[in-house]
UniProtKB/Swiss-Prot annotation:
PROSITE patterns: SAM_MT_TRMB. One of its GO terms (cellular component) is tRNA methyltransferase complex. Catalyzes the formation of N(7)-methylguanine at position 46 (m7G46) in tRNA. Residues 1-37 are annotated as: Disordered. InterPro entries: SAM-dependent_MTases_sf, tRNA_(Gua-N-7)_MeTrfase_Trmb, tRNA_methyltr_TrmB_bact. Keywords: Methyltransferase, S-adenosyl-L-methionine, Transferase, tRNA processing. It holds the Pfam family Methyltransf_4. Coiled coil: none annotated. Its EC number is 2.1.1.33. This is tRNA (guanine-N(7)-)-methyltransferase. GO terms for molecular function: tRNA (guanine(46)-N7)-methyltransferase activity. The gene is trmB.
Length: 255
């Protein structure tokens, strides 16, 4: 835990935060569905016509069988919170066509980018939520997910904004509820303080076990990891990311 916190990571500037879309909802509040660059006409068309067909509504009754969300059989289901430009989520969906994916992203530009990729590759195993990730977790049934990914989230570096970080005791408890035993929460960040924060919150949850035995386990991406645009930028600027994996322990193992 302390090793992750001691790496010399450089905090992102506020300009980088704006350029790097993220979905944050620490205590059930939704911090900003925003729009950056002006959308092209085709992107506007995708937002208007394709997004409604793929969007989920946590205000509706929760699905007893989440596989029904995809209109075809899926072996398991994963979610990615704050997918940004969608590079990682699209790569995962193409690599695992029998897995259902839900992506949460509040930024309209991020939605437009991933919709373009979904259309171009005819991807049928992605569903989307342009809203609060904590509402999505609360909406899903117990033990319904195989994995949750949180990749380069907004670190909210100012102390008064820490409550806006996605990783909070309440969201960790919700992740433990919706992940099946053996499922994983995966976290990537180049911000040392947020890595230490995440390790601290997960360490005090009996539902999770940090899957690291040596420093190389969290210094390097897991096999087949797709680097995001922000991740490549961080590497170019000399900022090392931590790649943290936490396994959902069974209730029997916790006893």
């Amino acid at each position: 835990m302390t090793a992750a916190a001691s790496d010399p990571h450089n905090p992102r500037s506020s300009a980088d935060d704006t350029a790097s879309p993220r979905c944050e909802s620490g205590q059930g509040s939704f911090f900003g569905r925003r729009k950056g660059h002006k959308l092209r006409p085709h992107q506007n068309g995708l937002i208007e016509h394709l997004l409604p067909r793929l969007s989920l509504d946590p205000g509706a009754s929760g699905p007893s069988d989440p596989a029904t969300l995809f209109g075809r059989p899926v072996k398991e289901m994963r979610i990615e919170i704050g997918f940004g430009g969608g590079e990682h989520l699209v790569a995962e969906a193409l690599a695992f066509p029998r897995t259902g994916f839900i992506g949460c992203e509040p930024y309209v530009n991020g939605m437009a980018k991933i919709l373009s990729q979904i259309e171009a590759h005819d991807i049928g195993n992605i569903r989307l939520l342009a809203g609060d990730a904590s509402e999505l977790l609360a909406w899903l049934p117990r033990a319904s997910l195989a994995r949750i990914d949180l990749i380069h989230p907004d670190p909210w570096p100012k102390r008064r904004h820490w409550k806006r970080r996605f990783v909070q005791d309440a969201t960790v408890a919700e992740m433990a509820r919706v992940l099946r035993p053996g499922g994983e929460f995966r976290f990537v960040s180049d911000i040392a303080d947020y890595c230490a924060w995440t390790l601290s919150h997960l360490a005090r949850s009996p539902g999770f076990l940090w899957l690291a035995e040596r420093a190389t386990d969290w210094h390097n991406p897991w096999p087949d990891y797709t680097m995001t645009r922000y991740g490549r930028k961080a590497e170019r600027e000399g900022r090392r990311a931590a790649y943290l994996r936490f396994r959902r322990e069974s209730d029997a193992a916790q006893a």
